[in-house]
Amino acid sequence: MIRTEHIVKSFDGRRVLDDISIEFETGKTNLIIGRSGSGTTVLLKTLVGLHEPDSGDVWYDEVNFTRLGFRERKEIRKDIGMIFQGGALLDSSTVEENVKLPLDLFTSKSEREKMERVNFCLQRVRLENANRLYPAELSGGMIKRVAIARAIVMNPRYLFCDEPNSGLDPQTSIVIDNLIHEITEEYGITTIINTHDMNSVMEIGEKSVYLHGGRKWWEGTKEDILHADNRELNDFVFASAMAKRAKRVAE
């Protein structure tokens, strides 16, 4: 189980995360949702150690990740897959080279073993025929799928996704959401996604946490959202639905 206890984080004197305590569901698709600027991205990056909390703790099972040194954290990070917003692919590397990078950096596997794993992951995201392409030759949805393949190439226990469907059209967003959720279920991964997209919540969210102004305002299942007695959350749901409708009309 991944959990946070009383996480506080400030930037330039402004408190971005304020006393955040959450228990994420093991082997499930967990979503951190909220308006832009609510602290969702900062929380996600704090969970993986890209930001250090001013106070509070992040736990992986019975291990206090926050209190670990660099070497000890490195061992846990081997179990973490990360999908960065925009994909964060290396422009000068092919698709298969991008996916293989974690294996090159963190394992002593033979080249044959690495390529077997790379090919398996590319097949899983349905990009086996794009292995020799470069990022500039890919669509937005293909870039996201390469990022997913790279994130799972080390067979992680935990998968963190920073707005994985940002910049995508509604149909492609659904494809990416479903792919991440399928992988979560198939391999029993604990997945945590930061998103502003209510469609993601209603389609794949097994547990969702709503942040507002850096505080946890609500948590529950997608079924609970429909009956939530929380005006701020209800306003967010309505605004998200209207924004989605406007985008579809514009397209």
In which residue ranges do the predicted regions lie?
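A short, proline-enriched helix->beta-strand linker immediately N-terminal to the Walker B motif
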Residues: V153-R157
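Helix N-cap at the start of a conserved alpha-helix in ABC-type nucleotide-binding domains
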Residues: P170-T172
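Conserved ABC transporter NBD signature motif
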Residues: G56-N64
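Catalytic Walker B motif of ABC-type/P-loop ATPase nucleotide-binding domains
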Residues: L159-D162
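Conserved ABC ATPase signature
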Residues: Y134-L138, M142
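Helix-to-loop junction immediately C-terminal to a conserved catalytic motif
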Residues: V48
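Conserved ABC ATPase "signature" region
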Residues: N64, E111-N129
